[in-house]
Amino acid sequence: MIAKQYGSKHITIKIKTLELLKIEEKVIELFRTFDPIFIRNSSVIFAAVQKAKDVGVSALLTGDGGDELFAGYNYLKRYFKDKPKLEEEVKRLWNIMHFPSGTIGKFFNVKITSPYLDEKFMRFAKSINISMKMGQYQNKLWGKFILRKCFEKWQHHEKHAWREKEAQEEGSGFSKIKDYFENQMFTNKEFLNEIKRIKDIESVKIRSKEHLFYYLTYRKYFLPPRSQKELLELRKCPDCSGGFRWIGKFCRICGAYPVTPIIQTE
């Protein structure tokens, strides 16, 4: 419906497992990470930009920032009755939000524009009262409430404007790759032997078969996190021993959450 509204063509991408694994490997190399959630979600963007490049598109618009600016994440609903806490958490998101689309766009030489991240628009969005960003409709609680209301005049708006929030990996189907790793990639014995070896030798905690595959792929390109001098700072992640350089609650290298960084004394 949205493509028709703007006179554009809607393209559906179908990706086989081996193709997805190649995409994930490139994401790991580009972003120096083996964080499963980041890899799955960023692979969605990678696949979309890659397809756009293949069909001759040179510029794309993204919705980056919408969830952060307008309280779109599902977990924020727990703060609905505590507006000061909701506002505090949304402001925290403003300070830590980062998106892979720019890096991926540069890789494919596709210009990425994110209207929500325009400085003037962000100032406007941040000035909107928090009570307008989360609200109730048809006995349900919704984030990005004011954005959804903007589409009420559209035909079939119920189907699109009031669509449930899903992570990119869920809405795209990329999350199904987890089953592949669990059932086809490693035997239980191989998995247990590998995670022990990696923990003992490289000081990295592996949490799943998927995580193991991503780490082994990461090691094709990079040293263990603790051996990368540029990552050694005052704080380090307790799960991977990599440098922890930001104010978020998870490690951007291994995906550990929640993280209490270790203060290094040497």
Residue ranges: model-predicted function:
Residues 45, 49:
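Short, conserved alpha-helix that lines the donor NDP-sugar binding/gating region
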Residues 60, 65-82, 92-204, 227-233, ...:
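Mid-to-C-terminal catalytic subdomains of enzymes
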